[in-house]
Amino acid sequence: MRITSVVSMIVLFLPLWSLAEELHVDLSSDQGWVFPEGNARIEKGELVLDGRQGSPKAFYTPYEWNDVALKATFLVEPAEKGVLACGFMVCAVNGNNYYYVHYDRGQAILCRSDQDNGWNEIKRVGNLDKPAGTWHQGEVQCQGDTLRVFLNGTLLYETQDPTLSGGRVGFYAGEGVAHVKDIVIAGEARPATDPLAFPPPMFVHVCTDAGAGAYEAFPDVCRLQDGRLICVFYAGYGHVAMPNDQLPKGGRVSYCLSSDEGRTWTPAQTLYDGPDDDRDPSIVQLKNGRIICNYFTLRAAEGKSPAWDGLGAWMVYSDDNMATWSEPRQISGDYYCSSPIRQLSDGRLILGVYAEKDGKGWGAVTLSEDNGDTWSPVIDIDNGGMRLDAETDIIELKDGSLHAAQRGRDETMGWSVSRDGGKSWSVSRAMGFPGHCPYLHRTPEGIILMAHRLPETSLHYSLDECTTWSENVLVDHVGGAYPSMVTLKDGSILIVYYEEGAGSSIRAKRFVATSQGVEWLPMEEKP
């Protein structure tokens, strides 16, 4: 076809390319554009995408392109934090499946997005001279299975991927405000006959902004006895949020509720906000109805590096279904927690904790026989000389023994077993694969799941009571993790985790686990 309704069309030669048509996109209006998330607009001859919260996209939909070259000039507004990314999308089959180049502060990362994962990395280059606040020219070409990425007229790399061959084009912003102009599309164009489809997402956001600075992290989810799900998480302005003028009490514990098995969530509310940075919360409802939220606290300390003191592990509880909460009680002054309290089959409570001294870390547990009113002295788990950061979670096995999984510092996590109800533990042994902040969960079929950070957000599963583990299963390409899981009413599993980076949010995905592996399920499909 010939494009005659836009500014100009010329025939040109591109390196290694056949004759192609060139379209200069008219940016005097938003005609032909689709902005699925909002936060994008045409303004003064520019496409403007505000990605300070979320990652807004803009698809140009009148035409589909094969053997395409997408070229544009872009600028990302300067900011102290955030990756300050502008992305170029090509071969968009729908709103979830496309190639894209992620131009951030100093990198150009070529990826493929699909229904299951938005970040299938193909190739990257770093150390680019690409300051924010300056206009740059980006370009991505896709001919057959060959992809090329350019910046400011220079070819950065060429690679191959056969997955996608044609579709729409577009742009996005990430953790910054991006401006795009001088958009030129070259290739074999044909008028699009169908609207751009947006398949249901494989994840939902539990919370994108709890009102404390738009940084949400370290989630934990459980089912309440009234059937609802509760997800607690840390809310602040960054990975550590000490009190300041904007957040006088520092980071806090927030929560959201779901009455539809995790598909939608209430706006965030504050569960606990002490005078310091309260973080890494976990939540459980005991058999007697008591709801306990455990967390740990950091207090600002000038002149130190890092600039805080740890105040240990704490808890608050509610005996009236969250109408009121107790005053905080300290569980331990020297140990910290990143996992939930577990109620054992005999009714006792056990909490995995951890400590570090002189560069050495180890896991530990503490026990309660009175529903959390008092806690035993901490029982250490010998790290066996392993380098552990040792965030510890516990699961009760079918034979009554207890299995502890511990965060690794180097190439592997650690594990230990107790055969006397948690009073003593075997020396930690290497699990054989890396992971941060493991979370253990048993499915209705008896499969034990262990979700963790590294690589990215991942999980393993065991069919033999933690004796052996599956190969790694990728959950998501975001790298925050600190995951948590709960069984839904249909037997599927909901996993929550966090994104990391400026504007980090809490995500949730749904899957079913069998002896054959893990199958991901759309979130909008009613459980």
Segments from the language model and where they lie:
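Secretory/extracellular carbohydrate-interaction modules
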Residues: 52-114
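Asp-box/BNR beta-propeller blade signature and adjacent active/binding-site loops
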Residues: 190-527
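Flexible glycan-contacting loops in extracellular carbohydrate-active proteins
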Residues: 159-179
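Extracellular carbohydrate-recognition regions
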Residues: 20-37, 192, 520-527
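Extracellular beta-strand elements of beta-rich domains used
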Residues: 27, 183-185
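Short, aromatic/His-centered strand-loop micro-motif at the edge of beta-sheets
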Residues: 116-137
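Short tryptophan-centered beta-strand motifs in secreted/extracellular beta-sheet-rich domains
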Residues: 70-72, 133-143, 147-149
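Short carbohydrate-recognition loop motifs
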Residues: 38-56
